[in-house]
């Protein structure tokens, strides 16, 4: 497969993901179900290892994992981050996405859920912003890859987050 064919396949795959997410948004009125559906789509279509949506608790600066893949219920319960705390909290604070090519080498990565085992994994985290307020974050783990591939994934996740902000 040529590089051009690979890029075309990736574009088709991403378009399919966006279409499926939009269909679920049109049908789903429960936020938790919608977030779980989106994670299912991402797991099926792009093969994420681990992923989590953390939403801001009402009237607080704490973000709590609302939906996750690749984590046990206990690991998910441990996923609570204050604004500015760790990478997820910094994304919530700044409203800017974060890309960590290798979490084992980043001292800011808290591994609060304790769901990672020290393998060479990239961590991508994007803010979910509605009316200029960060209402949540979406993070994924994926095998480490060249920086340009990770940056492309981060941009795609940002697009997914922007679309979801309207449904959350």
Give residue spans per PLM region.
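Signal-transmission linkers at sensory-effector interfaces
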Residues: 1-33, 44, 135, 167
């Amino acid at each position: 497969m040529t590089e051009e064919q690979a890029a075309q396949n990736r574009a088709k795959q991403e378009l399919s993901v966006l279409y499926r997410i939009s269909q679920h948004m049109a049908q789903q009125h429960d936020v938790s179900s919608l977030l779980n559906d989106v994670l299912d789509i991402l797991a099926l279509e792009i093969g994420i290892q681990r992923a989590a949506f953390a939403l801001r608790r009402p009237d607080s600066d704490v973000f709590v994992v609302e939906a996750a893949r690749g984590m046990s219920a206990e690991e998910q319960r441990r996923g609570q981050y204050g604004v500015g705390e760790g990478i997820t909290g910094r994304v919530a604070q700044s409203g800017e996405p974060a890309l960590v090519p290798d979490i084992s080498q980043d001292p800011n990565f808290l591994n609060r859920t304790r769901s990672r085992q020290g393998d060479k994994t990239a961590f991508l985290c994007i803010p979910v912003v509605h009316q200029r307020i960060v209402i949540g974050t979406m993070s994924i783990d994926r095998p480490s890859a060249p920086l340009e591939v990770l940056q492309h994934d981060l941009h795609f996740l940002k697009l997914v987050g922007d679309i979801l902000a309207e449904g959350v």
